[in-house]
Design a protein with these regions (language model features):
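An interfacial alpha-helical scaffold signature
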Residues: 2-134
Length: 134
């Protein structure tokens, strides 16, 4: 009987894998229309994988990547204590800011500014309180 139970357990269909939750990593602002997103299509973001994207915000362009929430929100403080992780992530952040600056004027953001979603970022930019954080 135990073998039958085991066989049934193994026969269960696998659950579909859900994509990991993402947060917004913010690199900086440019004036609209800003550099073309196409110029950065091969550039990888702070996590080494996510593309760099423009996001329209209050008449400006916010440059962002959608990065894993577990790494850049839930565990950011812990990860920042890991000097290897911190060095790699901050270098990638700076490389993105430098690439944007080569295409035009940019107001860079410091490393570690994350938002839950597009609306959260837009709200902060529109409130102008955000500029105290830069």
């Amino acid at each position: 009987m135990a073998a039958g139970v085991r066989a049934n357990r193994l026969a269960k269909p696998a659950r579909p894998t859900q994509a990991p939750a993402r947060v917004i990593h913010f690199y900086g602002l440019t004036q609209a229309p800003g550099p073309s997103a196409e110029s950065f299509r091969d550039l990888k973001g702070v996590d080494g994988a996510a593309p760099v994207e423009p996001l329209a915000c209050a008449g400006l362009i916010c440059w962002i990547s959608r990065v894993p929430e577990a790494e850049f929100a839930e565990n950011l403080s812990k990860n920042m204590q890991d000097l290897d992780w911190l060095a790699a992530a901050t270098i990638r952040h700076q490389q993105v800011v430098s690439a944007i600056a080569q295409a035009g004027d940019v107001l860079p953001a410091r490393f570690g500014i994350e938002f839950l979603n597009d609306e959260s970022l837009r709200s902060h930019i529109e409130s102008r309180d955000f500029f105290q954080w830069l």
